[in-house]
A protein has these predicted regions:
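ATP/NTP phosphate-donor binding region
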Residues: 66-67, 71-105, 124, 132-148, ...
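Short glycine/serine/threonine-rich phosphate/pyrophosphate-binding segments
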Residues: 166, 195-199, 299-306
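N-terminal accessory interaction module
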Residues: 5-130
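C-terminal functional extensions of proteins
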Residues: 11, 15, 283-285, 317-371
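Glycine-rich anion-binding loop/nest that anchors nucleotide
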Residues: 57-61, 288-309, 319-329
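Acidic/glycine-enriched connector segments
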Residues: 25-44, 49-53, 194-290
Length: 371
């Protein structure tokens, strides 16, 4: 899964120097373009020469003379914000390597941990400027995610963060992710630990022979949980990635709202948000091939009905498949299935929901429901 070619989806956005040079060369104008987080300090000559009326430069370092000139000709310049542990204007999604940079010196030094610390502090302060920066960041992430997923069939895999490595449930979720990826679907999860990591791991393992996943599961079981040490948990994942580089792509969509749950290292593309509501709705809305719900607690129950609501009202168009895994869990422990059935009765979503006993049945159920 590769990002969408230049401007195929958002044809007036510039997100790299190569794109900037291409637009200047081919159009001779930057009028009404949006330039995101591109260092333009070496492009002063172009900025002094071309039309920039109606353009917006979002977090783009540039020479003061160039900044003055583009403002004078009708552009908006949003300067880089010093001292932030993240770029609110970023034009791309995160990678595991970016979020876990400096892991060797301790998880607390990573950009992921530093962004979470900033979020906790500014949220406690009630700083309106920080709130604005979080909103800009999350919108930039959504924009990058939409560009990545154009034309893809996305299946969401939902489940709890408490599912430990080394368990039968974790292995089952990993095999599910692998089968879905091998079927040509893009696996998307909440991007965290537990069932989410397992499904991303399975997608990562898809290009390799079956023994790779078996061995990777064995290695990961040595650090079964992100508690008590996120560092040990993350390093085990990176050791697997180092042994088997160039794994299959998938998407993780975590949040700093639950920042104590770290992102997992097996999702190639990470859309990490500050606002959990934006993250959850975005993940479900983009799962156009359906959603598999593994056993979970309050968070997973909420996600089931977050997805059921637009299916019920058909507010996103035709209902998408919903497959719940583990009959005892969803009819006895957390009896969500009877209510979902009741809502679906005599509506078009009735033919788009299924309950299966075993995780191995989920891919066939998705296919049967039209996913």
């Amino acid at each position: 899964m590769q990002p969408t070619p230049l401007h195929a989806a958002h044809d007036r956005e510039i997100e790299s120097l190569a794109e900037f040079d291409k637009v200047v060369s081919e159009h001779g104008s930057l009028a009404r373009f949006r330039v995101q987080a591109v260092d333009l300090t070496d492009r002063t000559e172009a900025l002094l020469a071309v039309d920039t009326a109606g353009a917006a430069f979002l977090g783009c370092p540039m020479d003061p003379e160039a900044a003055a000139r583009v403002r004078a000709t009708g552009a908006l310049v949003f300067p880089p914000i010093p001292g932030l542990p993240f770029d609110p204007y970023r034009g791309s999604l995160y990678s595991p390597d970016e979020l876990f940079a400096s892991l060797d010196t301790g998880y607390e030094a990573t950009p992921d941990a530093r962004a979470y610390a900033w979020f906790q502090q500014t949220k406690a302060d009630g700083d309106v400027f920080a709130s604005m920066l979080r909103a800009i960041h999350d919108d930039s992430v959504s924009d990058a995610l939409d560009e990545l997923l154009v034309g893809t069939r996305v299946v969401g895999v939902m489940g709890g963060h408490a599912m430990a490595r080394g368990t039968e449930a974790y292995e089952g979720a990993a095999r599910l992710g692998r089968e879905l990826a091998r079927a040509g679907l893009t696996v998307a999860t909440g991007g965290g630990p537990g069932a989410m990591e397992a499904a991303n791991l399975g997608a990562y393992a898809a290009p390799f022979d079956d023994e790779m996943l078996t061995e990777a599961l064995r290695l990961l079981a040595e650090a079964p949980s992100f508690t008590p040490s996120i560092g040990d948990w993350a390093r085990a994942a990176f050791a697997v990635r180092e042994r088997w580089p160039d794994g299959g792509p998938s998407v993780g969509i975590p949040t700093w709202f639950y920042g104590h749950e770290p992102p997992n290292a097996f999702a190639a593309h990470i859309a990490k948000y500050f606002a959990n509501a934006t993250r959850e709705d975005g993940l479900l809305a983009r799962s156009n091939a359906g959603v598999v719900f593994l056993p979970g607690a309050a968070g997973t129950v909420q996600e089931i009905f977050d997805n059921a609501t637009p299916n019920y009202y058909e507010s996103r168009g035709e209902p998408t498949p919903m497959v719940l895994v583990n009959r005892a869990h969803w009819t006895e422990k957390h009896p969500t299935w009877p209510l979902l059935q009741s809502l679906a009765r005599e509506r078009s979503m009735e033919s788009r929901i299924a309950l299966v006993d075993r995780i191995e049945e989920a891919p066939e159920a998705l296919k049967r429901l039209g996913g």
